[in-house]
Regions:
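PLP-dependent enzyme catalytic core of the Aspartate aminotransferase-like
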Residues: 172, 314-318, 323, 327-361
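Phosphate-binding glycine-rich loop
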Residues: 67-106
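N-terminal "arm"/small-domain region of PLP-dependent enzymes with the aminotransferase-like
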Residues: 1-60, 145, 152
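PLP-dependent aminotransferase-like
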Residues: 99-158
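PLP-dependent aminotransferase class I/II
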Residues: 208-286, 291-293
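Conserved PLP-binding catalytic core of the aspartate aminotransferase-like
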Residues: 273-274, 284-318
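Short acidic capping loops at alpha-helix termini that bridge into adjacent secondary structure
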Residues: 80-84, 105-106, 189, 207-208, ...
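Active-site phosphate-binding strand-loop segment of PLP-dependent enzymes
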Residues: 135-193
Length: 361
């Protein structure tokens, strides 16, 4: 007699309430929801990437150590290649950190912040512990240190500039945590090219510091998923044990190297985004019923007195896609990425129309 199969008994208990991540597609809308570089990737650089990926590069496994890319990154940030690890986006690196150090322990997350810290903690079999930020979204250093000094605390995540709030944590605050804890402190600086203080100077003094960065935002490689981390060699040596072989494909490695060699092109785009950020801030402040928050990033957090889903849907009906936040931590809040001047104008016009409509309803 054939045994009956029940998948329920095989799934890890901590995954039962975890929902698959879904990124819905709205191809007809202006996409201002994911904090991407709004400008097309330069054609001149696309051809250079093609040259690097020619011949047998695509038919052979990539350099598993990504040595040339790590050398380029080290030169860009000002460290040694041995202190650099690359990954298939920062998500892979976050998960690998947690698989190495977090499983079975507590992971401290300064909510509201990047949602994937909690999700990857659950996947890795760690227990995510929220340590709420203050009313102005700054981190509560004393509370964080108190939690981090408990025996089961393994990893602290600090996102700066913080997603989705847009504010940055000072080096003094980061060091205030590092000085008082013995667990790992992961400082996610995905948006550093747009603002905030570089945490790299702290790396020499604190062996428990890990810094995360990415090519997805300022460098327009979100579609190729290239992230990297900077850490003490002893820390990276342990994470190497869980890293998948050949985890970053040859094409992505070639693209990242090309971007770094031509980063002046992206500096111009970054400057334009920063200028447009101020335009959008002024526009938001001019719309009745909208409160916006300061930003050190390529997006702006704002809130209204209405359900964020209603505002989101009203914008979508007018061809603009942004991020609806809501929930108990951010009621009525939304986040908009900075787009091109034309996209930003359409967003502001659409939001003004939506706010007038909900005000009449």
């Amino acid at each position: 007699m054939r045994e009956s199969f029940s998948i329920a008994g095989l799934v890890r208990p901590e995954l039962e309430k975890l929902m698959p991540y879904e990124a819905k597609l709205y191809p007809e809308a202006i996409k201002l929801d994911a904090n991407e570089n709004p400008y097309p990737f330069p054609e001149s650089l696309s051809s250079k990437i093609g040259e690097l990926a020619a011949g047998d590069v695509l038919s052979r496994y990539p350099d598993g150590a990504a040595l040339e890319l790590r050398r380029d990154i080290a030169e860009y940030v000002g460290t040694e290649p041995e202190q650099v690890m690359v990954g298939n986006g920062s998500d892979e690196l976050i998960l690998n950190i947690l698989l190495t150090f977090g499983t079975g322990g507590r992971v401290l997350i300064t909510n509201p912040t990047f949602s994937m810290y909690k999700i990857h903690s659950q996947i890795a079999g760690a227990r995510p512990i929220p340590v709420p930020r203050r009313g102005d979204f700054s981190i509560d250093v004393p509370a964080l240190v108190c939690y981090a000094r408990q025996p089961e605390a393994k990893v602290v995540f600090l996102c700066t500039p913080n997603n989705p709030t847009g504010n940055s944590t000072t080096l003094e605050e980061i060091e205030g945590v590092l000085q008082q804890v013995s667990c790992l402190v992961v400082v996610d600086q995905a948006y550093l090219e747009f603002g905030g203080e570089d945490a790299l100077p702290l790396l020499k003094r604190y062996p428990n510091l890990i810094i995360l960065r990415t090519f997805s935002k300022a460098f327009a490689l979100a579609g190729l998923r290239v992230g990297y981390m900077l850490a003490n060699t002893d820390v990276l040596r342990q994470i190497e044990k869980v890293r998948q072989p050949f985890n970053l494909n040859a094409f992505s490695q070639a693209a990242a190297r090309t971007v770094l060699a031509n980063r002046d092109v992206f500096k111009e785009q970054i400057q334009t985004v920063l200028e447009q950020r101020e335009v959008v801030q002024r526009g938001l402040k001019s719309i009745k019923g909208v409160d916006s928050y300061p930003s050190a990033t390529n997006y702006i957090l704002f809130r209204t007195n209405h359900d964020s889903k209603v505002i989101f849907q009203g914008l979508l009906e007018r061809g603009v896609l942004i991020r609806s936040l809501g929930g108990p931590e951010l009621p009525g809040f939304l986040r908009v990425s900075i787009g091109t001047p034309e996209q930003n104008t359409k967003f502001l016009q659409a939001l003004d129309q939506v706010m007038q409509q909900v005000g009449r309803d």
